[in-house]
Amino acid sequence: MVIRSLLLLLLAAIVPVFAESGIDAWLRYARLPSSATRGHLTSFPDRIVVLNASKNGPLASASSELHKGIKGILGLDLDVSSRGGKHCSTQKSIVISTLDTYQSACGKLSPKLNLKEDGYWLSTKGGSVQIIGQNERGALYGAFQYLSYLGQGDFSGKAFASNPSAPVRWSNQWDNLNAATAAHGSIERGYGGPSIFFENGLIKEDLSRVPLYGRLLASVGLNGIVINNVNADANLLNETNLQGLKRIADLFRPWGVNVGISLNFASPQVLGDLSTFDPLDDSVIKWWTDKTDRIYQLVPDLAGYLVKANSEGQPGPLTYNRTLAEGANLFAKAVQPHGGIVVFRAFVYDQLNETDWKADRANAAVDFFKSLDGQFDDNVLVQIKYGPIDFQVREPASPLFANLPKTAVSIELEVTQEYLGQQSHLVYLPPLWQTVLGFDMRYNNRQSYVRDIISGEVFGHKLGGYAGVINVGMDDTWLGSHLAMSNMFAYGRLAWNPRADSRDIVEEWTRLTFGLDRDVVSTIADMSLKSWPAYEGYSGNLGIQTLTDILYTHYGANPASQDNNGWGQWTRADSKTIGMDRTVSNGTGNAGQYPKEVAARFEHTQTTPDDLMLWFHHVPYTFRLHSGKSVIQHFYDAHYTGAATVQRFPAAWKSLKSKIDTERYNAVLYKLQYQTGHSLVWRDAITEFYRNLSSIPDQLNRVRNHPHRIEAEDMDLSGFTVVNVSPTECASKYKAIATNGTGTATTRLNVPSGKYTVAVNYYDVINGTASYDVLLNGKSLGKWKGDSETHLGHDFSTFLDCHSAIRITFEGVRISRGDKLTIRGTGNAQEQAAIDYVSILPQGVVD
């Protein structure tokens, strides 16, 4: 009998691993193992009591979510009762209510609560649970937090109030109405499939993904969403689409998510047959007032408008010599009677002349907006990107945060990894974001963290907040990557509490997404926390920016693209020196845009931190950093260290194979293995570029020294031709081989007999599917297709370059000296079979 009981206990503790697509993200509500629930179920509340819930409101969603979550996590099917505000029975119950209703029914809570808008009180002490929101939305947030504790096996008694750091916590989607006519497809900088909202210029009939998205947003405390691209299509405002907007808002409303829209400033001219869009013209004012009134008729709780104006070709008030504030206030006055707000982006800049030493895109936000401080209406938020340029791998906090004391502001973060690996690379972003949120601007020589400026605390504003460019799509993983969802989760957590710890956040996300196993949690957390420093290491260092191709995909390496154009993301690199001189004394003056204490620090190399040295200073490659290294040697070392870090990710993930469902395990492994290869492409391209430019060798003799490589152009070729690659540093030794038909490349292996890893670096472009076979002495080691576009979501290339460069590896291959290695490639449609090199790597050696 004892043996049987132990066996049953053991079986109950085993949680089966089922295939999962990722659609539920961190809201899986997976059953806890019995070891985590032992001793807690008998005393668990047996019913959910909802006080005075409005129909289809957040309180009703909270009760249904609690029922669903508890049934999934604990296997308990609790009774749910909805009661009016005059009833109060809380014994062994989970009571969920707004504060006013609860206190009216049950008396004052103790201790006295100071709940802000959307805040909540959560108590799990005693035999009952109290989830009390300042409003219905707050109660929903409290319910999700309680379910997070349960999902992590945390049954400890708690009693606390939680308030959001800022009232505005929005998702921004850059979805386009019509993928066929938009410059960047269905979702600009989206890597998780097509839009969940739009199709062929209209709002989709099938909006079934919308409430699922709303649920995810609400679960991390996000209360608003702008559904369309800031490069807005005026046709969103036609009557057909406004009816569709109502349908979207109705689906988000139960989750407490208010819908907002991006506007095209020229809409009165585009849609309204007016001859002007001058914001001070009476006919334009009337057009916007009437249009806004109509929108609020359909969507009475519309969050408001988001406006991108006079930037990157978008129309705006400067066309008519009106100020940006006058442009913002046009919309602010239209939405003010309805309680809406206007978010006006500070991302305004002009094309610049690089020959002008003083020209600097980083100055643009302050140049355009500082003089307008105090001229914006009270319901306007100026939305500021976290850094002065554009979502780079490292930037200083935008100085504009310290230059608008009379204006409410919000920060714009980018969850989608536009410049940071586009979800094909694991890059966990909170450590990057916290370098900005935790930066002290020292306004008037007093403590003034960016996070406290955003909240309104420093300058006394009621309005303030966060915008996260998330860009989910129709892919089951939402963002195109299971691990990238940690960034969406973390964005919500940091918008609620910007002091939250990055490791705590990713560990919570991991438990909810992949389970409680300690090895799973520690492995994913460790990889995640190493990922941003690694990506910075093999992409762009010392504040030089990401060094990606800014003229094409924003994905692979192309450091030359930064310079010799008007975009202003310059490195000013030549054969002797590198970096932007942003000093007041000799440069663009950008350092002087910061408050005095910070400006003095950034003005001098002696007090500028190494990680921003090239952002603020133009120095020789031989300049000695605080670390003691020269700039160029730091580049070499950082790129090799960063790439080496991610080489360890696949092995770490493989150690979890028995603990992760097969579907997600394989999907993540594919991306991590891809990242190991692409990080080497990055490493080699950047180090080779600056080795060529500076003529300074790597002190450790790694750059240009690849003893395990066999260049494809040096093999015996049949059917292949030697081709150029551009940029040249995107190919080892600057050349590749390619064929439109079928070709073979053959060589004899002059290596000691033993076990090796065979790696093939090739190119995978879109618009075709080339096929490959690698053979040893005529026997196939493996076949594959150039079809990575079916597994990866980044912006693909039609060229042989650093975007299309990719690697495949075959481990544990036994080779004898003199063996014949052959690669057979066959082109297909527009894709040539193209090969860069082969590496024959001793076990444990990184190329």
UniProtKB/Swiss-Prot annotation:
EC class of the enzyme, as a word: hydrolase
Protein name: Alpha-glucuronidase
Glycosylation sites: 52, 238, 321, 353, 586, 692, 740, 767
Task performed by this protein: Releases 4-O-methylglucuronic acid from xylan.
EC number: 3.2.1.139
GO CC terms of this entry: extracellular region
Catalytic activity: an alpha-D-glucuronoside + H2O = D-glucuronate + an alcohol
